[in-house]
Amino acid sequence: MARSFVVGQDEQAWLELNATAFADHPEQGRMTLADLHERQAEAWFDPAGLVLVEDVSGDRPRLVASHWTKREPGSDEGEVYAVAVHPQVQGRGLAGPVTALGIGYLARTGARSISLYVDGDNDRALRTYRRAGFEIAATDVMLAHP
């Protein structure tokens, strides 16, 4: 079942999903409640644009995926900010529909174009986004010296 994020109710469950889904990601997987509150205070944050997907087959709903969108006020561009799928349900075809839910939200709010950033070695995400109609617009490379 899909629904929108509810401020004051969903923070902890979403943080747990995000940490699990992005366990190997240096920034996204380490988001704290304070980090989440900072983003909620941004002008672009809209709880309706943070789509949650719950598994309702058990005794109580369990958050299994989310699609957080971003749209700056006054901009006609939307962003796929973060798509998270719990590892226990990865490979079951959730990423595509979850991505589509967020894209639909952005379209309904008037976004004329949608962008996203993805790690170049994340083949699963790249396949999902290509199937959704995204094309590579730019490639960034980050180098570091030890």
Put a short name on every predicted segment.
Residues 1-16:
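A short beta-loop-alpha structural element at the N-terminal edge
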Residues 25-84:
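A conserved beta-strand-loop-helix scaffold within acyl/acetyltransferase catalytic domains
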Residues 81-85, 103, 112:
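Helical hairpin unit composed of two closely spaced alpha helices linked by a short loop
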Residues 83-90, 119:
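A short, internal acetyl-CoA/4′-phosphopantetheine-binding micro-motif in the GNAT/acyltransferase core
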Residues 90, 99-107:
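A conserved short alpha-helix in the GNAT/GCN5 acetyltransferase fold that borders
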Residues 91-92, 96, 120-138, 146:
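Conserved active-site alpha-helix within GNAT-family acetyltransferase domains
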Residues 106-117:
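Conserved GNAT acetyl-CoA-binding A-motif
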